[in-house]
């Protein structure tokens, strides 16, 4: 029997073809269009579209709340640039989680780096996300049926941010909101939150950090160790050219040595995988 190896990219294209559609829906808002970096979920309809406009944009990197009339969150990314957004109403056969996951995976396949990821009540109040952050009342729904993700695209588009927000409303209608922000000036170094690293690790089984190709960087060691110590039950394999040095650095920050094994000493950057 002849076995043919299918390239990963081709295999993913086959998988996603059942989820995504490039065909515009007749019910789409007039003048709207898809964003080139996030394919449309099959049978989804565009119900809100805002063409590129230059503005100052603030993206939360923490649970949001309102105190004395002011929106509060632990961290943020703020910059001036061009913002384009599209909101999809999803077909009944797909949940908001389906759309969110498919969009996230499509962006990660393009090398996008996750900066902040929250789900359900960890995000704060849906009404604040809908009205204060995105200015779109269609996105107001149940606090426990929401998800938000902020990503940074890979080179050569590293000054592009993408925000995803999914929600299921009380009437069970599900929506996915996507924003593409092109910064007018270089964004510089942006670090993810420790909780986001842990969520990514537990959701996908791995962390791939190609930019961390050299010796351990103090800021990253601190972030990763804090994330790993949020769930001490995980056992992990650390791989990469400097895997041994990273393992030692993480142990030095309080991660138990028994939890960490050293994997292959090659590859691009740093890779951490969950031992199943």
Question: Over which residues does each language-model region extend?
Answer:
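Bacterial N-terminal signal peptides that target proteins for export
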Residues: 1-12, 19-22
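An acidic-aromatic pocket/loop used at catalytic or ligand-binding sites
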Residues: 25-230, 244-255, 261-276
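Generic structural signal for beta-strand residues in well-ordered domains
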Residues: 17-19, 229
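Hydrophobic beta-strand segments of well-ordered beta-sheets in folded domains
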Residues: 231-238, 258
């Amino acid at each position: 029997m002849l076995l043919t190896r299918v390239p990963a990219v081709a295999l993913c294209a086959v998988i996603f073809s059942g989820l995504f559609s490039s065909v515009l829906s007749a019910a789409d808002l007039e003048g709207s269009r898809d964003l080139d970096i996030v394919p449309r979920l099959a049978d989804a309809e565009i119900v809100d579209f805002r063409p590129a406009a230059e503005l100052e944009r603030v993206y939360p990197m923490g649970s949001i709340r309102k105190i004395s009339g002011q929106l509060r969150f632990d961290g943020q990314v703020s910059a001036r640039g061009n913002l384009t957004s599209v909101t999809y109403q999803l077909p009944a056969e797909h949940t908001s989680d389906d759309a969110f996951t498919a969009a996230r995976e499509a962006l990660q396949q393009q090398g996008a780096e996750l900066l902040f990821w929250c789900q359900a009540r960890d995000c704060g109040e849906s009404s604040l996300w809908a009205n204060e952050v995105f200015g779109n009342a269609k996105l107001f729904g149940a606090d426990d049926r929401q998800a938000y993700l902020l990503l940074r695209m890979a080179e050569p588009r590293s000054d592009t941010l993408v925000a995803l927000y999914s929600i299921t409303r009380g009437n069970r209608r599900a929506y996915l909101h996507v924003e593409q922000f092109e910064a007018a000036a270089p964004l510089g170094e942006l670090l993810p939150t420790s909780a986001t690293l842990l969520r990514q690790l537990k959701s996908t089984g791995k962390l791939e950090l190609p930019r961390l190709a050299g010796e351990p960087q103090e800021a990253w060691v601190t972030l990763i160790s804090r994330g790993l110590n949020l769930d001490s039950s995980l056992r992990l394999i650390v791989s990469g050219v400097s895997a041994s040095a990273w393992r030692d650095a993480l142990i030095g920050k309080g991660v138990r040595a028994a939890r960490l094994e050293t994997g292959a000493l090659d590859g691009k950057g740093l890779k951490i995988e969950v031992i199943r």
